């Protein structure tokens, strides 16, 4: 009986995948691209092309709770798997 109970606990933990954290590519470091484990509640990676001039833009990447709203008609792409915003 103890073996059955222990087996059920192990199977439950494996199936629930406790502690999963989304990993997104970020542009927080100056001139560099890194990855970041998103904080709890932030389950979306995003990539935004922020236009400075019509032919010049910055790419901003990171984690978010929801897909950020578009400002100034900047294109944005959101996704929900590890490093999908690369």
Curated annotation (Swiss-Prot):
Subcellular location: Secreted
Signal sequence region: 1-21
Example of a GO cellular component annotation carried by this entry: extracellular region
Keywords on record: Disulfide bond, G-protein coupled acetylcholine receptor impairing toxin, G-protein coupled receptor impairing toxin, Neurotoxin, Postsynaptic neurotoxin, Secreted, Signal, Toxin
Primary localisation category: secreted
Other comments on record: Negative results: has no effect on M2 (CHRM2) and M4 (CHRM4) receptors.
Subunit structure: Monomer.
Family stated for the protein in its record: Belongs to the three-finger toxin family. Short-chain subfamily. Aminergic toxin sub-subfamily.
The protein, known as: Muscarinic toxin 2
């Amino acid at each position: 009986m103890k073996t059955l109970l222990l087996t059920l606990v192990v199977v439950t933990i494996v199936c629930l995948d406790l502690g999963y954290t989304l990993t997104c590519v970020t542009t927080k470091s100056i001139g560099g691209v890194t990855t970041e484990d998103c904080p709890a509640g932030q389950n979306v990676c995003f990539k935004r092309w922020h236009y400075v001039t019509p032919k010049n833009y910055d790419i901003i990447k990171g984690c978010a709770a929801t897909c950020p709203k578009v400002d100034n008609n900047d294109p944005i792409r959101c996704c929900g798997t590890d490093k999908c915003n690369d």
